[in-house]
Design a protein with these regions (language model features):
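Short acidic-hydrophobic, aromatic-tinged amphipathic segments that line or gate anion-handling sites
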Residues: 14-15, 88-89
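Short acidic/polar active-site loop segments enriched in Thr and Asp
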Residues: 33, 107, 168
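Tandem CBS (Bateman) regulatory domains
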Residues: 1-10, 49-86, 93-102, 123-164, ...
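Short basic, glycine-rich beta-strand/loop surfaces that mediate nucleic-acid
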Residues: 183-192
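Short, basic/aromatic recognition patches
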Residues: 18-25, 96-98
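Short proline/glycine- and acidic-rich turn/helix-capping motifs at secondary-structure junctions
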Residues: 176-184, 215-225
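A glycine-centered beta-loop-beta connector
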Residues: 27, 35-51, 101, 109-125
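Conserved short beta-strand edge segments in small beta-sheet-based binding/regulatory domains
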Residues: 170-172, 202-222
Length: 225
């Protein structure tokens, strides 16, 4: 999945010479937490709600008005912004984004095109939205979690068995992280299976693989192994 498919666009930006009051107004109006700071079309920094608090701006979630007399609100954004912010290209992947957010311990990134123009923003919220969609959490279904011997065809054997019981495969996620050596963990979401068939499937799978849990989102039931 590419950044351009999940980023928020267009980017809400602010001039680096604008006042803190202007930044506060934009953050509140658009319900966002960060703004790319610009000099014309050139990205020169980024300012976040945390930067504003560290810079001494009043708590703008309170009744303080951005247009009030507080002199701190008249400071230029460039005085508190983070210069040379980390960016990401629109044709990079969501995985690249998540890695940068973790490494730099930041909430989001300006998205640029090949010409260096800011065309959007991607934040942790966008990453969460991607995860919810990718693993099928936005829809009902039944999630199986299991640990499999890490060999060719191990996941196909399980999904073939699920189909034999009438299930439709929704999403599959597999990882070696936190699995025992020589194993992998698989998370498979299925749909369109009746309760008797589901019960038999769980019983058969439990005899063949190391089941971790089954969560039936349709019935609000879970079984931990």
């Amino acid at each position: 999945m590419l950044v351009k498919n999940w980023m928020s666009k267009p980017a809400i930006t602010v001039n680096a010479d604008a006042k803190l009051a202007d930044a506060i107004s934009l953050l509140e109006k658009h319900e966002i937490h960060m703004l790319p700071a610009m000099e014309g079309t050139r990205l020169v920094g980024i300012v976040t709600d945390q930067d504003l608090k560290r810079g001494g701006a009043p708590d703008y979630s309170s009744s303080t008005s951005p247009n009030g007399p507080d002199n701190r609100l008249q400071m230029a954004i460039r005085e508190i912004m983070t210069m040379n912010p980390v960016t990401i290209y629109d044709n990079q992947t969501i995985e690249d984004t998540a890695q940068l957010l973790l490494v730099h311990k930041i909430l989001g990134l300006p998205v640029i095109n090949l010409f260096g123009e800011v065309i959007g923003m991607i934040t942790k919220s966008d990453i969460f939205r991607f995860i919810v969609t990718a693993i099928g959490m936005s829809k009902d279904g039944i999630q199986f979690a299991m640990e499999l011997v890490d060999r060719s065809g191990c996941i196909k054997e399980v999904t073939d068995m699920m189909r034999d019981y009438g299930a439709r495969i929704g999403t599959i996620f597999a990882t070696h992280e936190r699995a025992k050596r020589g194993y992998r963990q698989a998370y498979i979401r299925i749909y369109d299976i009746d309760q008797p068939s589901l019960a038999r499937l769980v019983e058969v799978l439990s005899e063949k693989v190391n089941m971790l849990y089954v969560i039936n989102c349709q019935e609000g039931m879970s079984e931990i192994f």
